[in-house]
Amino acid sequence: MSKQFDVLVIGAGPGGYIAAIRAGQLGLNVACCEGNPYDDPKGEARLGGTCLNVGCIPSKALLASSEEFENVQHHLGDHGITVGDVKVDVAKMLKRKDDIVGKMTKGIEFLFRKNKVTLLKGYGKFVGKSAEGFQVDVAGEVVTAKQVIIATGSKARHLPGIKVDNDLVSDNEGALKFPAVPKKLGVIGAGVIGLELGSVWRRLGSDVTVLEALPAFLGAADEGVAKEAQKQLTKQGLKFSLGVNVNEVTTGKNGVTVKYTDKDGKAQTLEVDRLIVSVGRVPNTDNLGLDAVGLAADQRGFIEVDDHCATKVPGLWAIGDVVRGPMLAHKAEDEGVAVAERIAGQKPHIDYNCVPWVIYTFPEIAWVGKTEAQLKAEGREYKAGQFPFMANGRALGMGHADGFVKMLADAKTDEILGVHIVAANASDLIAEAVVAMEFKAASEDIGRVCHPHPSMSEVMREAALAVDKRQLNM
């Protein structure tokens, strides 16, 4: 007789492992299967998904290391500190990154044991459905579950005609383990991954050129934020070419040649040592056997779900990158918790308008809610308040005075509709805005909250006060 569970989670990325842990906390008999070994030396399945193994966590480790190098080289002098010759040990830097990843994967294994989650090593594939539940093959063993949560995540999108070998031409995985700093680096795609990885290698010494098909930089972000971010990144040495069309990519003994047409229609050639292709991601739904349970992905590979992440098949759920909405780890985590609680009979709710976005360049870029362009398109009247970090004592003392906070509020009710930040610690500052918006706060609420002084968080308060043109320190 096959193993039987109340809940089976397919995929142990941020959405999947969090869903499994929450289901375990709620007293459900839960299992989670994962088959991807990533770079495990023994070839065994590793927990954490793309985010932990080849995405969010390792990239932030390298971003931190490269920021330290940048600071020593270019900013310690401002503090009266003189250093000698500074060198980069890429191998040691990569080992630090790998050690962090290993520590966190072991942490998830511990959390599974703590919450009585059964770990099944192997890819999950539906093979049928019976009165007992859904039947899923995991590494040759068929298990049965009354409820199944699909959390298989996504993979890098590859462009037709461009062979990604993760050597000379890399996606996000290969770009995290260059054995040496490339002299010249090309990046196709000025999205989150392209900007972050381009920043890492630029700080370490690469001459980085970013090619972007769209005519505008960071089109999803607030226009003012995008302009400020592009200005700061350009000042740091990143080169941008927007509105381009990549025609051909070839590799040879001297590196990579990219032929493209620029925004003016002129043919251009870019010669680089390595190339990163970061043009989005596609859902991992290819080999799930969805037809065996009466389900199918759409033309783009996404699984259709309702507002509660339920599919059209009762008892079958899907979360994270395989469903609608932004491909963000924290969005997947929230969906995982919500689905586990709904299976247990609770009635959770996710406000997708309050899901924050962060790009971990320097300065960081973060936002939540609506942009000015979106509010104008909706015909909604709003007020805007903006305050710069250059007027903040803590930011000046830290040498992080670039950027600003912009707050948008309803013209009549004063409800906060969006907050947009360019700042050294925007990823931390945005959390206050998320909490405020979850509780339908007004800009006046933030303006009347006492913020610690001196701190960069004061700029959030000043931006709130600026909504009614009553900022105090400008």
Curated annotation (Swiss-Prot):
SUPFAM superfamilies: FAD/NAD(P)-binding domain, FAD/NAD-linked reductases, dimerisation (C-terminal) domain. GO terms for cellular component: cytoplasm. PANTHER family: DIHYDROLIPOYL DEHYDROGENASE, DISULFIDE OXIDOREDUCTASE. NAD(+) binds at residues 189-193, 212, 246, 278-281. Pfam families: Pyr_redox_2, Pyr_redox_dim. The active site is a redox-active disulfide bond. Its cofactor is FAD. This is Dihydrolipoyl dehydrogenase. Gene3D superfamilies: 3.30.390.30, FAD/NAD(P)-binding domain. Keywords: Cytoplasm, Disulfide bond, FAD, Flavoprotein, NAD, Oxidoreductase, Redox-active center. Binds 1 FAD per subunit. The keyword Zinc does not apply. One of its GO terms (molecular function) is dihydrolipoyl dehydrogenase (NADH) activity. The branched-chain alpha-keto dehydrogenase complex catalyzes the overall conversion of alpha-keto acids to acyl-CoA and CO(2). It contains multiple copies of 3 enzymatic components: branched-chain alpha-keto acid decarboxylase (E1), lipoamide acyltransferase (E2) and lipoamide dehydrogenase (E3). It is found in: Cytoplasm. The active site is at residue 453. Disulfide bonds join 51-56. Its EC number is 1.8.1.4. Signal peptide: none annotated. Belongs to the class-I pyridine nucleotide-disulfide oxidoreductase family. It catalyses: N(6)-[(R)-dihydrolipoyl]-L-lysyl-[protein] + NAD(+) = N(6)-[(R)-lipoyl]-L-lysyl-[protein] + NADH + H(+). GO terms for biological process: 2-oxoglutarate metabolic process. FAD binds at residues 34-51, 60, 124, 321, 329.
